[in-house]
Amino acid sequence: MLPSHLNGHSPLARRCPRLSAASPPATGDSDAAAAAADAPLAEHDRIYFQSYSHIGIHEAMIKDRVRTDAYRSAIMHHQKFIEGKVVMDVGCGTGILSVFCARAGAKCVYAVEASEMATQAREIVKANNLDDKVVVVHGRVEDVEVEDKVDVIISEWMGYMLLYESMLPSVLFARDKWLKPGGLILPSHATLFMAPITNSERYEGSVDFWSDVYGINMSALVPLAKKFTSEEPSIEIIGGENVLSWPFVVKHIDCYTFKAEELKSFTTKYKVSSMMLAPIHGFGLWFEVEFNGPSNPTDKSPSDLNPLDVIRKKRRRGSEDPVVLSTAPEDEPTHWHQTILYFPDPIEVKQDQIIEGSVKVSQSEENPRFLNIQLDCTTGGQTLVKDYAMR
């Protein structure tokens, strides 16, 4: 578990495994399942899956009612596509989503889990009298060889700032190998948002604090505090009042068509205007996922929409609209919080002042589950170029 600079959360202490499915074996200990579980792992995968063997991560995820209720609502919303069908749960963890799907009438659910939590998932399935419907497969989705096609793929693959931990490629692998034409993917779409933020309380508490400690001048520590604060992305909760402009779209993902290669590196340019007079302390990132069918070719992606239209659409959703899970600052907090890229020094902006630049997100060469972020920001004649490593 790696330390987070600002709040003690380890980014790696979060997400879930990569997986695979198979036709229901006669027993939970089939040769295919054993082979998948024993397949050699890269060191970064071994550490990653080992972290998901600890109950604490699963407790945090399941206790996140925004997350868990959104998935349960999405399953019931799409019950007619699940009832009597074959479902694959990629990275099932404790098996809670698999149980939801089985209770929604799925004929068979392949619950694929690469960590040792698969053992407990199998016991949970049995304790709920669903072992005739839910087959727990212990192994990575990339390592299981099966002939069956599935009607639905469900997965809770999102990491901090959506893409940290890089589990999405496993879902796309399952899609390409096992999803039937016209099948359903839950969630279906994901959008990563970003906006400049102000957070004087946070900055003063971590940096300015050192100027006077119990009457002792410790300002010699201020440069170190600035470096420490802006070295890595911070996982913390901010509110809508901290956001200085309308958000812009960093990346939109259609899970029906997206290619894993697109995650290796991408750059987004932005140009926003400040809604108030305030210091910019950095940029915040958050995401939302939507549980829907394939996109209509005529549909606009979020990058084509005015941010105000995106927010208004979210606020007026009716019972027939797709279920949306949002981690935005103005919405109820989740265990994902928001991801903050702090500046070493704040930049003062006036109302309506233009803030522009680019953000580049790329997978780390040392570990594809890690992210490198390069931020370029220009406003009021000042330019900041800063690299962040999300380890």
Curated annotation (Swiss-Prot):
Which terms does the record give in the GO molecular function aspect? Answer: histone methyltransferase activity; protein-arginine N-methyltransferase activity
Q: What class of enzyme is it?
A: transferase
**Which named protein is this?**
Probable protein arginine N-methyltransferase 6.1
Query: Which organism does this sequence originate in?
Result: Oryza sativa subsp. japonica (Rice)
Sorted alphabetically, the keyword list is: Methyltransferase, S-adenosyl-L-methionine, Transferase
Q: Which residues form the SAM-dependent MTase PRMT-type domain?
A: 45-391
- What EC number is given for this enzyme? 2.1.1.-
Q: Which SUPFAM superfamilies match?
A: S-adenosyl-L-methionine-dependent methyltransferases
Q: Name one GO biological process term.
A: methylation
Q: Which cysteines are joined by disulfide bonds?
A: none
Q: List compositional bias (Low complexity) regions by residue number.
A: 20-35
Explain the purpose of this protein. Arginine methyltransferase that can both catalyze the formation of omega-N monomethylarginine (MMA) and asymmetrical dimethylarginine (aDMA).
Region annotated Disordered, chain positions: 1-35
Q: Which PANTHER family match?
A: PROTEIN ARGININE N-METHYLTRANSFERASE (PTHR11006), PROTEIN ARGININE N-METHYLTRANSFERASE 6.1-RELATED (PTHR11006:SF70)
